[in-house]
Amino acid sequence: MTLPTRTLGALTVSAQGLGCMGMSQSYGTGDETESVATIHRALDLGVTLLDTANVYGAGANEELVGRAIRDRREEVVLATKFGIVRDAEGHQAARGDAAYVKQCCDESLARLGVDHIDLYYQHRVDPDTPIEETWGALAELVEAGKIRYAGLSEAGAATIRRAHAVHPVTALQSEWSLWTRDIEAEIAPTCAELGIGIVPFSPLGRGFLTGSITSASQLGEKDMRAGLPRFSEENLSANLAIVDTVKALAEKRGVTAGQLALAWVQAKGEHVVPIPGTKRRTYLEQNVGAATLELTPEEISELDAVGEGVAGARYPEHLQRTVGR
C-alpha cells in the first residue's frame, strides 16, 4: 500500500509518520512484540517516516526501532534526535556543543544499527551554546555522510533563522494540534517563508482528542500526562467540551474524532507531516485512515474555533521554559 507523499524541505516522506516514543516511555508499560509489529504494519501501510530519539527510554527506543527495521531499512526515512540530557533524578537540560553532537550521532548510529540517519533533529536548543556551533557540527555530519538532513525541535523563529543561515533546516518538529497552536503566530509562518517542513508531534493532543480519556484517574503512575497541567482532573473536565465538539463533527463526517483531528493538522499545508504516536496496530490503522481525509472549508473553520479557551498550560513551568528558544 502507498500513502500520499509530502516534502520536508528537499526530503520526500509519507504524508503521515509514526512517532515511536511511547513504545519505550511516557505512556505506561511497553510491549516490544506489539511495538515491532506496529512498526512493520506501518511500513506495510505505506508509512515511511519513523521518529525516535536518543533520550527515549535512555536509548532503548532507538534499539527497538533498529531491530524492527533491520531487514526493511530501504523502506524507511529514519529520524532521530539529540540534545536533551537527563540526570539521575530525571531533571532535563539541553546540550548542543559540537563534540557532543558528533558523539550522540555515533551512539545513535550504533543503537539503530544503520550507517546513516535520514533526518537528525536538535531536540532542544541549548541556551549556553551558540546555535551556529551546533549547526556547524550538523553540517559536518552531513558532509561525512552520517546524516542526510538536519532539523530542529521546539525552536523559536529567530533561532530557526540563525540555524538555517548555517545549514538548511529541513524540518521543524513541534507540538501542533487542535488544542496546542502556539506555533501559528510566528514559527509556522517562518517555516513557510524559508521552505522548511513542519512535523507536528502529539497531533492528537496526547490522545485526549480521540475521546478515550475522560478522567485523570485513567492515567497510571508511569504515564507522563499525569504531570501535565491540562490533564489535572479540574482542567481535563473543563476541556471535555472540546472533545464533545470534535466527536459531534466527526460523527457527521462518518470518521473517528482522532481522524478528524489529524485531518485538521494535515490541512495546514503540504509541508506539514504529523507523526501521531502509538504502540498498537489498532490505533495505527485508525490514524493512517486519516492520511487521505480532506476537510471542507466549513469543517476547518468549525474545528479552528474548537481550540479557543483550553484549560491548563501545555507543560509545567520548568519544561515550558525549554521550548520556543
Residue ranges and their predicted role:
Residues 1-76, 323-324:
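N-terminal binding-site loop/beta-alpha segment at the start of enzyme catalytic domains
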Residues 11-16, 46-48, 72-76, 114-118, ...:
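Short, well-ordered coil/turn segments that N-cap beta-strands
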Residues 66-80, 136, 140, 144-145:
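Alpha-helix-loop-beta-strand connector modules within alpha/beta enzyme cores
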Residues 88-182, 186, 197:
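Glycine/proline-rich, positively charged
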Residues 183-221, 256:
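Aromatic-lined glycan-binding groove of carbohydrate-active enzymes
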Residues 193, 221-252, 267, 271-272, ...:
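Terminal-tail/helix-coil boundary detector
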